[in-house]
From Swiss-Prot:
Protein name as annotated: Protein Turandot X
Family per similarity comment: Belongs to the Turandot family.
Species name: Drosophila erecta
GO CC field: extracellular space
Signal peptide feature range: 1-22
Keywords: Immunity, Innate immunity, Secreted, Signal
Biological process (GO), any one: response to bacterium
Domain of life: Eukaryota
Disulfide-bond pairs as recorded: none
Function, in words: A humoral factor that may play a role in stress tolerance.
Pfam families: Turandot (PF07240)
Acetylation found in the keyword field: no
Subcellular location: Secreted
Principal subcellular localization: secreted
Amino acid sequence: MGFYISSLLICVFLGIVRFASAGTYSSSYEAHRNYLLNIFHNPFVNDSIKERNIPELIAFYHRYPTEVPLSDEDRQQFERFIHDYREYRRVLIDGVPPQGGSFGNIFGHFLGRVGTRYILSLFNKQREEGLSNQATNSTIPPLRIQYLTKLS
């Protein structure tokens, strides 16, 4: 009898935890997606900032693999980019990963093909859902960047 009661309590506990974390997943997803859109879909953000955030984009892709609609070909190309990126970062020069140089070529190839489609799919999905006002204005730069461009 004790086994059944403890099993029931565990099931109830897991149900409560799952229910409580359901809203967290959605808000975490939205925050992460908005962050990436503000970086990769913003023409005012330079390439070096985008390059530094590629690991964040890859983490997002792995954390939410089915959330962004991609064709099978685009998904394969993105997986190939991730593989190439990791191989590039794995190469050590004097015990340290490369600090620039030819990586711009990999990044340029990524932005020109797969990355643009992935970010546009991410942006279009957000626009279709119509979840927030920022979704329709994601190409507007953040206030700090607007301020900096006014000073120039």
